[in-house]
Amino acid sequence: MSTSPDNLFCPEQNFYGPDSEKIYIDGSLHPVKVGMRRIKLSKTYTLHGTDFSSFPLYDTSGPYSDPSVTIDLHKGLPSTRDFWQKNRTDIEVCPGKNPSPMNNRTPVRAKQGKSVTQMHYARKGIITPEMEYVAIRENQQLEEWIERFSSNGSSVKPVTPEFVRDEIAKGRAIIPANINHPELEPMAIGRNFRVKINANIGNSALASSISEEVEKSVWACRWGADTVMDLSTGKNIHQTREWILRNSPVPIGTVPIYQALEKVGGKAEELNWNIYRDTLIEQAEQGVDYFTIHSGILLDFLPAAQRRTTGIVSRGGSIIAKWCRAHKQENFLYSHFDDICDILRSYDIAISIGDALRPGSIADANDEAQFSELKTLGELTLKAWKYDVQVMIEGPGHVPLNLVEENMRKQLEYCHEAPFYTLGPLVTDIAAGYDHVNSAIGGTLLASLGCAMLCYVTPKEHLGLPDKNDVREGVIVHKLAAHAADIAKGSPSALLHDKLMSSARYSFAWNDQFNLSLDPVKTRQVHAESSQQNTGDGTDDHFCTMCGPDFCSMKKSQEVTGK
């Protein structure tokens, strides 16, 4: 297979329809331009004394929703952040490295003895361009609405660059933004910001190609994924990652142990620190924004894991466990954690400390192995912070609803309020084929309690490698979970979104309903199919085919109230 795919194409940039337009908001502290997507509404809705004829949306699609940008996937996206970095004196070109053939850019790193992390700057009181970008992005150009909302007793205020800096300095939030990923549009992960979602992609030894994975990554961010993880374990891992990074406006994460294992022919016992270190640096120079590193699984925890119903279900965790048993030594990712942090701070790579012992069945939830590792993750968090490395903590897994709250409580206690990033949790073991819904149920509850980012699950979970349609389904369902959690947390912008949808629904403004939904394409398609028996497309009807013209409750309500 060629490592330079020739069947890539730029997707339709008017994807969201004629009522959607790309807008950019300028920063006041730095030369940043923050992209958003604005929906033009068919009428003006008055809510609490404020008129809305349009609604700005938080947008993860980058230039893929801007028709004015020419995109060539073989050359990658425009380098948004290069301009911000050009006057920096704390970075240098990596010696002996050639420019990327895609963007003609030579990788950089921190100068000797320097740290270039967002946490480092935040602790020094410096507001970076990335921090201002995040503040503008989180507000969605709704500062006036948020202020009005807070004047009615809400504790939620508009996000300021100083607030972002303070959250980063305290370790409660991260901005994953490798200095070698200039195509990135910065975003924040933290419980005092919007709940984010991650989409996993990546080939396997049995399926997929570079072009398919690039297509899935673009597809994921266009449907609303805030970050993407490339979990490739098959051929051409390096090349696949390069193509994904150069075409990604969202942060990209990886699990470096997968590529390290490939380098030793899949034999876990032949891994060593030198191979892993070289893999970290290789991926750092490409621009990976965060690494999942399973440093918390220790020899002492393995007996407890052996007593489980489903053992160790983390791929990275099982690799490390096999290495530890083969060598009768402590996890080298734990022993070399200081060395790892020294590398990460040189490129501003965040660490997602992996939950190698997450429960893979509800029978194993909240057990000794899981919480023993969680305590170790808290210990490693403090160590990483000494290096100014940004940290988030990975969480479960399979957890029944009655045990979900304990996970959040212990994570905050053990891990010093570092952001929590969880795979669901899935709340039952019997939902094969529907595990994306299963995951969203647990994720909604956990996010409402403070989980900062949900890792999506697709309908293929436990069954096979997802295709791009599975990616879409997983993203939308988890965007729903994140939005529901934002509402529960009192987010003024999330509540406004729902208020506008309700107003459009009561007004039978069908196009507004389509455009305000999480999946405008599907809602428009489903409505059109249902309306085919009537004349036209149904967008002028004051009813739908569920109730018809004579049994529509909202229509009857309007007749009764006169409004």
From Swiss-Prot:
Which co-factor is required?
A: [4Fe-4S] cluster
User: Which Gene Ontology terms of cellular component type are present?
Assistant: cytosol
Q: What EC number(s) are associated with this protein in UniProt?
A: 4.1.99.17
Presence of the UniProt keyword Translocase in the record:
no
Keyword annotations for this protein, in alphabetical order, are: 4Fe-4S, Iron, Iron-sulfur, Lyase, Metal-binding, S-adenosyl-L-methionine, Thiamine biosynthesis, Zinc
The note describing how and how many cofactors are bound reads: Binds 1 [4Fe-4S] cluster per subunit. The cluster is coordinated with 3 cysteines and an exchangeable S-adenosyl-L-methionine.
What does the record give as its pathway? Cofactor biosynthesis; thiamine diphosphate biosynthesis
What does the record give as the reaction this protein catalyses?
A: 5-amino-1-(5-phospho-beta-D-ribosyl)imidazole + S-adenosyl-L-methionine = 4-amino-2-methyl-5-(phosphooxymethyl)pyrimidine + CO + 5'-deoxyadenosine + formate + L-methionine + 3 H(+)
Binding residues annotated for [4Fe-4S] cluster, in chain numbering: 544, 547, 552
Q: Which family does it belong to?
A: Belongs to the ThiC family.
PANTHER family in the record: PHOSPHOMETHYLPYRIMIDINE SYNTHASE, CHLOROPLASTIC, THIAMINE BIOSYNTHESIS PROTEIN THIC
What's this protein's name?
A: Phosphomethylpyrimidine synthase
Q: Which organism is it from?
A: Chlorobium phaeobacteroides (strain BS1)
